[in-house]
C-alpha cells in the first residue's frame, strides 16, 4: 500500500510541476493514512472543487505509462538536482540524512520521503483527495503558510473503495468528533494552543480513571506525593533534561530576584528531591512514589491534535527507588500493575518493545556504555523471566536509560505506546542526584530508579478509550450512566423522579428526560448521545416500582431486573 501512496505522491508532484513550473515544494510525508504534500505557488490555488479535475489529470498521467526510476543519492547531488526547490532542500539538509531518495521520470527529478515505489505510472489507477488546507513551513507559526494537499492512490477502484470505508470508520472513531457528542473537553485560543480545558463530563471520566488507577497503585505499595509544576533551571541542568530535552521544554521564566524557573516537562527530578528529603537505609527500599503530575511540553503548533498531542498534560507518574538486588522483583511487580490496569480497560498488548540506545548517537543518549550495557541486560532478563515476546528497537530509549514499551493496536490499526517501564542508573549517579542508601554494613551504595508509566497521561489515554469504544464507554466510566424516560409526562413523570431519588442515593449518574417530545425521539436522541442505559417508566413500571425496564446502548430489546440487581450493573471495578 505504501508503495502506491508514495507513487501517487510523485505523480501529484509531476502534475503540479507541469501546471506551474516555478512551484516550490515543502514538507511531504507518506504513511498508512495516505500522503500529504506542501507546496507554494503563485498560480495554483487548489480547493476541494478542483479535486475531480486533478484526478482526471492523474488518470491521463496513468494512461501515459511513463516508467519511473528510483535512485539514492548523497546530499551533494541532491542539492544539485533539486536546486530549484529551496524549501525542500532546507528540510533535507536539516534532516542530516546521508542519502536522499530521488525518482526520475522523463529526465525530471523528484524527491520522495521513502524508497518504496512502483516502476510505472500506469500501475496507479485510482486516486482520491481527502482535504486541502494550510500548513506552516516546518510546523512553525512564524514561518510562511504553504498549501497542504492530502490524498492517496491505489492499484484499482475496488481497493480504494475498501480503503474509503476504513477512512469513514476512522472519522466515526475520531475522539474529537466523539467529543462533540459527549462534551468532555474543549480548547480556546485565549487559554493557548494545546491547553485542554476539561468540561464537567470530562472531569468525571478523568476522576473515575484516576480513582481506579490510584486504588491499584495503593494495592501495590505506591505512596502519593505532590510536587510543584515549576522547577529551578538548575534542577533540570542537574538532571540532564536541560541539555537533552530543552527544545521540548517551555522557555525559562526570569524572576525579579534573579532566579530562573521552568515549567516541568516531567517529575523525575522532583521525585529525586523527595528521596533526598532524609537519609535512606536499605530497609527503606523499595520506595514507590506516585503523582498525578501536571506537565508542560512544547509541541510544535502544527503537531497539536486534540487530546493526543497537547502542551499541557497530566501524567499518572510513578518512580520506584530500589536496590540493585530488587530490580528484577520491582520490574515484575510493575508489569503486574500494568497488566491489571490495562485489562480493566479492555485493552490488549499488540507488541512489547525493548527500546535500546544507539551506541553511535552520542548526542541523543548519555555517553556511558557501561551503564547502558548493565541496564539493558537487566530489562531483557526481566522480559525473559516473564516469558514475554519482545522486539528490540535500537535508538528508541530515553536519553537516560532503556525502557520496555507496551504497544497497543487501536481500533484504527494505529500502534501507540500506552505503558512503559524504564530503568535508570543515570539520575541516581553521583554526577546527578547521588541517590544512595546505607547498607547493613553501614556503607553506602548507589540506588536505582525505575520509571513506571501505567496509562500515560489522562489526555492521551482518554483519546485512546474514545477511539477504541467509539464513545460508548463502559457503564462504570460513562459521565452520564442512565436516563429515565417517562412514556407520558403527565402520567409517569412523578414515578421517574421517585426512581431518580433512589438511584442518586446510590451515587449513580442519572437524569430524567422530561422534554415534551415523543417517546421514540427521546430514545433515539439518547442512543445518539451514547447513554449506556435507558430506563422506561410506563403504567406497568408504576404498578411495580421495584422492577426496572431498561435498554442498553446499541440494543433493540428491553430487559427487566429487580432494582437491587439492576444497581449491581453499575458496579465499579
UniProtKB/Swiss-Prot annotation:
Zn(2+) binds at residues 268, 319, 451. PROSITE patterns: AA_TRNA_LIGASE_II. The keyword tRNA-binding applies. SUPFAM superfamilies: Class II aaRS ABD-related, Class II aaRS and biotin synthetases, ThrRS/AlaRS common domain. Disulfide bonds: none annotated. One of its GO terms (cellular component) is cytoplasm. The keyword Lyase does not apply. Signal peptide: none annotated. Residues 174-474 are annotated as: Catalytic. GO terms for biological process: threonyl-tRNA aminoacylation. Binds 1 zinc ion per subunit. GO terms for molecular function: ATP binding; metal ion binding; threonine-tRNA ligase activity; tRNA binding. It is found in: Cytoplasm. It comes from the Bacteria. Catalyzes the attachment of threonine to tRNA(Thr) in a two-step reaction: L-threonine is first activated by ATP to form Thr-AMP and then transferred to the acceptor end of tRNA(Thr). Also edits incorrectly charged L-seryl-tRNA(Thr). Homodimer. Belongs to the class-II aminoacyl-tRNA synthetase family. This is Threonine--tRNA ligase. The gene is thrS.
Amino acid at each position: 500500500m505504501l508503495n502506491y501512496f508514495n507513487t501517487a505522491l510523485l505523480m501529484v508532484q509531476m502534475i503540479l510541476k507541469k501546471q506551474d513550473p516555478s512551484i516550490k515544494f515543502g514538507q511531504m510525508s507518506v504513511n498508512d493514512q495516505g500522503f500529504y504534500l506542501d507546496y507554494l505557488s503563485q498560480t495554483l490555488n487548489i480547493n476541494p472543487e478542483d479535486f475531480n479535475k486533478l484526478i482526471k489529470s492523474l488518470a491521463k498521467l496513468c494512461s501515459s505509462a511513463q516508467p519511473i526510476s528510483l535512485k539514492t543519492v548523497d546530499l551533494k547531488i541532491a542539492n544539485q538536482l533539486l536546486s530549484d526547490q529551496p524549501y525542500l532542500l532546507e528540510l533535507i539538509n536539516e534532516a542530516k540524512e546521508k542519502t536522499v531518495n530521488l525518482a526520475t521520470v522523463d529526465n525530471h527529478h523528484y524527491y520522495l520521503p521513502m524508497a518504496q515505489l512502483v516502476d510505472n505510472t500506469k500501475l496507479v489507477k485510482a486516486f482520491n483527495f481527502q482535504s486541502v488546507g494550510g500548513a506552516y513551513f516546518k510546523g512553525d507559526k512564524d514561518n510562511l503558510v504553504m498549501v497542504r494537499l492530502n490524498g492517496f492512490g491505489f492499484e484499482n477502484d475496488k481497493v480504494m473503495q475498501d480503503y474509503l470505508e476504513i477512512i469513514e470508520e476512522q472519522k466515526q472513531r475520531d475522539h474529537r468528533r466523539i467529543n462533540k457528542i459527549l462534551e468532555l473537553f474543549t480548547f480556546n485560543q485565549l487559554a493557548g494552543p494545546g491547553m485542554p480545558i476539561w468540561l464537567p463530563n470530562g472531569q468525571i471520566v478523568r476522576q473515575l480513571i484516576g480513582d481506579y488507577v490510584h486504588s491499584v497503585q495503593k494495592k501495590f505499595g505506591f505512596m502519593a506525593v505532590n510536587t510543584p509544576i515549576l522547577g529551578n533551571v538548575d534542577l533540570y541542568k542537574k538532571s540532564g533534561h536541560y541539555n537533552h530535552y530543552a527544545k521540548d521544554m517551555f522557555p525559562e521564566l526570569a524572576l525579579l530576584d534573579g532566579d530562573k524557573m521552568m515549567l516541568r516537562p516531567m517529575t523525575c527530578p522532583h521525585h529525586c528531591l523527595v528521596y533526598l528529603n532524609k537519609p535512606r537505609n536499605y530497609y527503606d527500599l523499595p520506595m514507590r512514589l506516585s503523582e498525578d503530575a501536571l506537565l508542560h511540553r512544547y509541541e510544535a503548533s502544527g503537531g497539536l491534535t486534540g487530546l493526543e498531542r497537547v502542551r499541557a498534560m497530566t501524567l499518572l507518574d510513578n518512580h520506584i527507588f530500589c536496590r540493585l538486588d530488587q530490580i528484577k522483583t520491582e520490574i515484575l511487580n510493575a508489569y503486574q500493575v500494568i497488566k491489571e490496569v490495562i485489562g480493566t480497560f479492555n485493552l490488549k498488548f499488540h507488541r512489547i518493545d525493548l527500546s535500546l540506545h544507539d551506541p553511535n548517537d552520542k548526542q541523543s543518549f548519555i555517553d556511558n556504555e557501561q551503564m547502558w550495557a548493565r541496564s539493558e541486560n537487566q530489562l531483557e532478563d526481566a522480559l525473559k523471566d516473564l516469558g514475554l515476546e519482545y522486539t528490540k528497537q535500537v535508538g528508541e530509549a530515553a536519553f537516560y536509560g532503556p525502557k520496555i514499551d507496551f504497544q497497543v493496536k487501536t481500533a484504527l490499526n494505529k500502534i501507540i505506546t500506552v505503558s512503559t517501564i524504564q530503568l535508570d542508573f543515570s539520575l541516581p549517579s553521583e554526577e546527578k542526584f547521588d541517590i544512595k542508601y546505607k547498607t547493613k554494613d553501614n556503607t553506602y551504595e548507589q540506588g536505582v530508579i525505575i520509571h513506571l508509566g501505567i496509562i500515560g497521561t489522562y489526555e492521551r489515554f482518554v483519546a485512546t478509550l474514545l477511539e477504541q469504544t467509539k464513545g460508548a464507554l463502559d457503564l462504570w466510566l460513562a459521565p452520564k450512566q442512565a436516563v429515565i424516560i417517562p412514556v407520558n409526562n403527565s402520567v409517569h413523570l412523578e414515578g421517574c423522579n421517585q426512581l431518580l431519588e433512589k438511584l442518586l442515593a446510590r451515587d449513580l449518574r442519572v437524569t430524567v428526560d422530561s422534554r415534551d417530545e415523543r417517546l421514540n425521539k427521546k430514545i433515539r436522541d439518547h442512543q445518539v448521545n451514547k447513554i449506556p442505559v435507558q430506563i422506561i417508566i410506563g403504567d406497568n413500571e408504576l404498578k411495580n416500582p421495584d422492577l426496572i425496564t431498561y435498554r442498553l446502548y446499541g440494543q433493540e430489546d428491553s430487559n427487566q431486573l429487580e432494582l437491587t440487581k439492576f444497581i449491581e450493573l453499575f458496579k465499579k471495578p
